[in-house]
Each structure stands twice: as C-alpha cells, then as structure tokens.
C-alpha cells in the first residue's frame, strides 16, 4: 500500500488533499527558500524558480523518511509564487510587506505559478522523480482601506504566496480565477493526478492506501 507523503506544512495543501479523499503523511521540509532562490540567476523564469524549490523540498523530505515509510511511498512537494509585471511575490512574512503587496496587486491580474515535484520510493530507493509547474491567472479586487487593514490584521496573508488565500478570508477580494482553483490553494489536483500516473500510481490506489477517516 503506497503512502502519499505531503512534503509541506501548508494547511491549505493538506485540506485540498483531504477534501479529495487522500489523508497523507505530513513531513515539512525545512528548506531555506531564500537560500535556494539566491542560488538561482536573476534571469531564472518564475516556472523554474518554483520548480527548483519544489524539487529541493521533495528531495529533502524523501531523504529524511524512515525506512518503513520509504519502503513504499510517493512524496509530493510544492512551491507557489505570484508574478505581476515579472516580479515574484512569495510569503510576505510581515504586515508591512503584505500591505505593500496588496497595494501592487489590487485591481490587477497576476499569474500564480505552482511547482510540483513527485518522488516515488520503493524498497528505500528512488525509482522515479518528476517535476512540473502549473500556472493560474488571478484577478484581484480592490478592497477598501478598512477591509484591507482588517484582513492584514487577521494574519492569514503572512504565510501564503502572494499574501492572499482563495479558500479563506482573502477569497472576498478575488474577482476571478482562470485555471485550476486547487493550484491557487497550493497543490493542483489535475497536475498531481498526471504526475502520479507517470509514476505508475492511480488515484484509486491513493484513495485505498490513504483513506480519510
């Protein structure tokens, strides 16, 4: 029975998988995202940035798994970044940064890139790995100053790419989404299904081995 390991501490990604019938093992990577990004060239594309980060996370998680889990499992890690006018926006980390991001985003459209990396382990060996990036266009609304400050004060925006959520309070300020909504939350179900299939794993098998109880 192949266990699915979510290499992420993201509550949003965990929620997406559980709502889709899979209760994964959770193992946060601890990768220093700033350090990895600093090692990339300034001309690195958004797709390559998130793909590199997703692979770094998945690789670290896979290497730290117990022998019992690594005997038969698949690791998936993701990374998301919002791009507006070629500038990437990650997690704001502070209210001041989140406010600045929203001032740049309000009333505009941005592209959310989410890198996905899947590593298949069998008998404690990597038998397959693949990474790919999905992109979704998001049209942001124009929250009033009062609404924006209330949203920033709740803290939700600080630890999510772009400083917003679709499935939380930030959903009030998203006017439209063009593409896969689950990608906006942090893990794209269509792309994940495709990557698992390439690793020889069906969604039916994942449901059976990782049931939500």
UniProtKB/Swiss-Prot annotation:
Its cofactor is a divalent metal cation. The active site is at 79 (proton acceptor). One of its GO terms (biological process) is nucleotide metabolic process. Keywords: Cytoplasm, Hydrolase, Nucleotide metabolism. CDD domains: Maf (cd00555). The keyword Aminoacyl-tRNA synthetase does not apply. It comes from the Bacteria. The keyword Cytoplasm applies. One of its GO terms (molecular function) is nucleoside triphosphate diphosphatase activity. Its EC number is 3.6.1.9. InterPro entries: ITPase-like_fam (IPR029001), Maf-like (IPR003697). GO terms for cellular component: cytoplasm. It catalyses: a ribonucleoside 5'-triphosphate + H2O = a ribonucleoside 5'-phosphate + diphosphate + H(+); a 2'-deoxyribonucleoside 5'-triphosphate + H2O = a 2'-deoxyribonucleoside 5'-phosphate + diphosphate + H(+). Transmembrane segments: none annotated. It is found in: Cytoplasm. It is an enzyme of class 3 (hydrolase). Nucleoside triphosphate pyrophosphatase. May have a dual role in cell division arrest and in preventing the incorporation of modified nucleotides into cellular nucleic acids. Belongs to the Maf family. This is Nucleoside triphosphate pyrophosphatase. It comes from Mycobacterium leprae (strain TN).
């Amino acid at each position: 029975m192949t266990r699915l390991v979510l290499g992420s501490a993201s509550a949003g990604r965990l929620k997406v998988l559980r709502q889709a019938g899979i209760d994964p093992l959770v193992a946060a990577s601890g990768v220093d995202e700033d350090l990895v990004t600093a090692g990339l060239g300034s001309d690195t594309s958004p797709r390559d940035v998130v793909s590199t980060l997703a692979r770094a996370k998945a690789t670290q998680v896979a290497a730290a798994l117990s022998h019992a889990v690594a005997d038969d499992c698949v690791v998936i890690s993701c990374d998301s970044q919002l791009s507006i006018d070629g500038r990437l926006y990650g997690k704001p980390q502070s209210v001041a940064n989140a406010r600045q991001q929203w001032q740049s985003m309000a009333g505009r459209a941005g592209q959310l890139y989410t890198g996905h990396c899947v590593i298949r382990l069998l008998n404690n060996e990597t038998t397959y790995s693949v990474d790919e990036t999905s992109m979704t266009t998001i049209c942001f609304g124009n929250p009033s100053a009062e609404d924006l400050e209330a949203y920033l004060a709740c803290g939700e925006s600080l630890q999510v790419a772009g400083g917003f959520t679709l499935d939380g309070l930030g959903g009030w300020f998203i006017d439209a989404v063009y593409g896969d909504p689950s990608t906006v939350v942090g893990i794209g179900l269509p792309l994940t299904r495709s990557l698992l299939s390439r690793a020889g794993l069906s969604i039916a098998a994942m449901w059976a081995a990782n049931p939500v109880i």
